[in-house]
Amino acid sequence: MTGIGARTAWRNAVGRRPRNARRVSRIAYRVSRVACRVSRIAYRVSRIAYRVSRVAWRNVAPAARRAHRPFPAVIHIASGIPLPTEPLPAPPVVVDRPASPDDAALIAPDDLARLLRGEHDDPFAVLGIHAESSARDVVVRCLLPGAARVELIDAASARTLATLSPVGSGELHAIRLPAPGPLRYRLRAHYADTVRDLDDPYACTPWLGSLDCHLLARGEHRDAYRRLGAHPCVHDGLEGTAFALWAPNASCVSVVGSFNGWDARVHAMRKRIECGVWELFVPGVGCGALYKFALRTRDGDRLLKADPYARRTEAPPRTASRICAPSAFGWRDDAWMRERAAAQSAHAPIAIYEVHLDSWRRHPDGRAYSYDELADALIPYVAALGFTHVELLPIAEYPFAGSWGYQPVSLFAPSARWGEPDALRRFVERCHLAGLGVLLDWVPAHFPQDAHGLARFDGTHLYEHEDRRVGLHRGWNTLVYNLGRHEVANFLIANALYWLREFHFDGLRVDAVASMLYLDYDRDDGQWLPNVHGGRENLEAVAFLRRLNETVHADAPQGAITIAEESTAWPMVSAPVAAGGLGFDFKWNMGWMNDTLSFMRVDPIHRRFHLDRLTFGLLYAWSEQFVLALSHDEVVHAKGSLLAKMPGDAWQRHANLRLYLAFQYAHPGKKLLFMGSEFGQEREWNHDRELDWARLADPASAGVRRLVGDLNRLYRRRGCLHRRDADSRGFRWIDCADSHQTVIAWRRIGDAPDDFVVVVCNFTPQPRTGYRIGVPAAGFYRELLNSDAADYGGSGLGNLGGVSSEPVPMHGEPHSLSLLLPPLAALVFAAPGH
């Protein structure tokens, strides 16, 4: 046998076994390593489970650790599922032996010190009723500053069971009791001048359910206003108010108010760490009580904040929130709510009267009208003028009157300036019963820096961006919402739904959308941060606006609309989200407003050089669902009233205004007019004064108002003036190039080709005789409106009620009309047979 063969035989006989054994040992070693790692992971999981169980023991299941106290059935508000309950409690235990000082001193010195300083982050771990480790005794502790003596009494019979002993300075009282069975108790506090029987808030179960916490943490709780804030309710069989506040970075939070002497030590709140919300149910506190939240920041600062979800507040300049009961208002506007989707569609006539409630009309002593008084006066006034909608400047509570409501602090509270919330509901209902829709100006773009508001709410930049290049609006000195934080976006979307659901508003006009869309809005180079792609588009705001519109259209009552105040050329603002748009129903046409007002300011002798300012808007009129807005922004800040913008003497200024309003109503787009413009107020709007109603004694002003009423009725009655506002087939120029005579003419066309009106506008004070325009059909063209009619304060020139066509080709049409054009006037003619 060769050497090679011998080695092979040896390996076959002996050598492989040791190698296999080594392999097996290596595998066994690796398996043991894996097992060791698994055991370490299991140990860590057990540690985490232990910590979670401790949190749950402290914060979620106090009933299990407080003398095994059984609670009545609690309905999980978010899910509607009743939680299981234990049997009814046994009769209360009567304590025979007196309490001793040793029994009372059952609190760690550190816990006592933090309670007395109002700095305890887990009051439920100390206050209330707690089982001792032996499970044979319980300890009851309560913090009642000012109480000379505190007794434990039977909840059913009010019998005194024991007297608690004061601890330390005497503001904390405590006692140890034997606990052979369940104990249901109340506290009887003896003060210097009164005795009060109290239910212990620290013996109550949590207010928020697990589903609430889950949805709040994800920013998907569309009913957040029904869980956060202050809610009078029956909880654990007790009447009181549940308080809940999102302040994840605060070290401790208390609710303070008129019910506890504004003492932050009395009602310290429990933190739900899974969502960053602090909560406490306070028995015996009811509607009307004033309150705020006292927060201690991680830096040790103390803050006193109004409730972001408060549904009522004190009237400014006071800043406390007020507990408000759930409304039991019995709405009677079902018919309107069913039909409003059609009344607010893109094909419907929409003519909006914009109102600032504080300055529309006032009492002789200067007081503003209340909601009910406005309903008595404003609704019939607007309805008589033929408007379809009222739009209210922001009414969410705001501290600074000079902001007109555009710097709100309490977004869920109708301003107390004009009454209580149900009075606002009555106003909206009466508008609906009168056939008027109600739109609300809504401000999600920014908020003021008032100390009691949202700024640095829990000591951190909770609602706003931390970087001032994103979080500060320099033009308004306000803070910008951090829309990329889902809790903040949820706060705003829940607020939008709140107004639409709870007050039956028919839509929201969303303020300052352009400032939301652009990161460099009103910022110089170096003062803004680009997005992740290096651009200036605010991607978080785009996502928020799309989500807002989708939510409103899905979850608000049917037919609610959204309108964007967007002043740039951002595309597809009113296109559906599914098509790549922002999802608004309508967009203010700021370009039309700026161009046409600049034209009207020009002296008529020079207008022929600027005719493009009137016609340019028709190049993009079909790109969006537009609202032609002549709003409050155009009559303030030294801009003058609409009438003051018009050139010429008094007669010419009124004639120009009448012409401009007629031009607006005959132009494609929905209509909006700010209060006072309907009668040609001469003075610039002042938010501290009512409108100049005395001007209606002037025939010229009365004539302007009469014209506005007739324009509204004509606009609503003639389908060709509104059905195809965003359809190029609904408009056709007759002549847009007669700059020499400064005259333009067009047709508005309805669903049928023969349903149209002819509009002719003369923008000079020179009457035009024999002015010929082409028309498509032969027949008599009845004059529907003449802004120069004597009834409106004009000269009375016109066409004697109408004109018959002549077979003279003009402007590419086989027929034409020979017209007398009054000075500074608009004429509207109906098609033959219409």
Curated annotation (Swiss-Prot):
Keywords: Carbohydrate metabolism, Glycogen biosynthesis, Glycogen metabolism, Glycosyltransferase, Transferase. Pathway: Glycan biosynthesis; glycogen biosynthesis. GO terms for biological process: glycogen biosynthetic process. It is an enzyme of class 2 (transferase). GO terms for cellular component: cytosol. Its EC number is 2.4.1.18. The active site is at D511, E565. InterPro entries: A-amylase/branching_C, Branching_enzy, GlgB, GlgB_N, GlgB_N_E_set_prok, Glyco_hydro_13_cat_dom, Glyco_hydro_13_N, Glyco_hydro_b. The keyword ATP-binding does not apply. GO terms for molecular function: 1,4-alpha-glucan branching enzyme activity; cation binding; hydrolase activity, hydrolyzing O-glycosyl compounds. The keyword Zinc-finger does not apply. Catalyzes the formation of the alpha-1,6-glucosidic linkages in glycogen by scission of a 1,4-alpha-linked oligosaccharide from growing alpha-1,4-glucan chains and the subsequent attachment of the oligosaccharide to the alpha-1,6 position. PANTHER family: 1,4-ALPHA-GLUCAN-BRANCHING ENZYME. Belongs to the glycosyl hydrolase 13 family. GlgB subfamily. Monomer. This is 1,4-alpha-glucan branching enzyme GlgB.
